């Protein structure tokens, strides 16, 4: 096994300041990649739990460097394609190429009403679209292929959630990511660019570990234990579990894997 299978590669990761995005950045850096990290680092009004901060992004920079990777980190909003383009270009200016895209940025909506629907669609679906769109020209121009990984959710494969517009929007967005993945996988295959999606169950991150999410579990109009229980005896998986899957999809070990929905969910989807 190669110790640093992504040596010389460059990965563009959104939502990289903490949680899953940080785990992806650190794991890919440990595997040899340089990182272009983007995160909004400010609050969205309809999101009830605290989002990332500039200090969180700075901590990711330190962790990536400790793992042996170079990193360019910028604040940017996936809802704003221009800000993503600026962030990506800063990384390209530094590292000279792009090989891996991880469209990870996302928010969880609980009882946020119609504003929640709009914001979760804008971040979790349109933001993924923007991320891929700004990266495609460079990947194609280089002519060396690439790997695009879209972070969806177990909620993108089965129908779960409450009847609140924010929760419905989350399910709709995560299902929509699957459609994007499948279409991109076909469109980009001739350029040897692979596109896949990863579908976590609940992950031990600030998105889940906050008082607002726990309150939502107790008040949502659904059978929470039935709908949110995993098959394997674990309540929450770790960010590194998801990052391991992303690292594999980014590597040559998955060189002929494209168009795949990959659950990393402790059997959550299969139990439905």
Curated annotation (Swiss-Prot):
The keyword Protease is assigned to this record: no
Top enzyme category: oxidoreductase
Record-listed NAD(+) binding positions: 12-34, 39-40, 77-78, 104, 174, 203-205
UniProt-annotated binding residues for substrate: 153
Active-site residue numbers: 170
Taxonomic superkingdom: Bacteria
CDD domains: SDR_c
Family annotation (Pfam families): adh_short_C2 (PF13561)
Transmembrane segment boundaries: none
UniProt EC number: 1.-.-.-
A GO MF label: oxidoreductase activity, acting on the CH-OH group of donors, NAD or NADP as acceptor
Keywords in alphabetical order: NAD, Oxidoreductase
Glycoprotein in keyword set: no
PANTHER family: 3-OXOACYL-[ACYL-CARRIER-PROTEIN] REDUCTASE (PTHR42760:SF133), SHORT-CHAIN DEHYDROGENASES/REDUCTASES FAMILY MEMBER (PTHR42760)
Recorded family membership: Belongs to the short-chain dehydrogenases/reductases (SDR) family.
Protein's recorded name: Uncharacterized oxidoreductase MT2820
Lineage: Bacteria, Bacillati, Actinomycetota, Actinomycetes, Mycobacteriales
């Amino acid at each position: 096994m190669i110790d640093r299978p992504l040596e010389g590669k460059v990965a563009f990761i959104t939502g990289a300041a903490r949680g899953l995005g940080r785990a992806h950045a650190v794991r890919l850096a440990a595997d040899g990649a340089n990182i272009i990290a983007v995160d909004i680092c400010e609050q969205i009004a309809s999101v009830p739990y605290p989002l990332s901060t500039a200090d969180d992004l700075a901590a990711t920079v330190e962790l990536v460097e400790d793992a042996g990777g170079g990193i360019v980190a910028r604040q940017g909003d996936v809802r704003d394609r221009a800000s993503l383009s600026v962030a990506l270009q800063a990384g390209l200016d530094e590292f000279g190429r792009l090989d891996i895209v991880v469209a990870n940025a996302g928010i969880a909506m609980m009882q946020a009403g119609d504003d929640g629907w709009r914001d979760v669609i804008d971040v979790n679906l349109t933001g993924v679209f923007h991320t891929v769109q700004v990266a495609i020209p460079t990947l194609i121009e280089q002519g060396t292929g690439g790997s695009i990984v879209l972070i969806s959710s177990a909620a993108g494969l089965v129908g779960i959630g409450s009847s609140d517009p924010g929760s419905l929007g989350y399910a709709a967005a995560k299902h929509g990511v699957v459609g994007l993945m499948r279409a991109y996988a076909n469109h980009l295959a001739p350029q040897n660019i692979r596109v896949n999606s990863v579908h976590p169950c609940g992950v031990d991150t600030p998105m889940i570990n906050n008082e607002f999410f726990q309150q939502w579990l107790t008040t949502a109009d659904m059978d929470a234990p039935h709908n949110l229980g995993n098959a394997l005896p674990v309540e929450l998986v770790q960010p590194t579990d998801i990052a391991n899957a992303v690292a594999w999809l980014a590597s040559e070990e998955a060189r002929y894997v494209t168009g795949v929905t990959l659950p990393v969910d402790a059997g959550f989807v299969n139990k439905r």
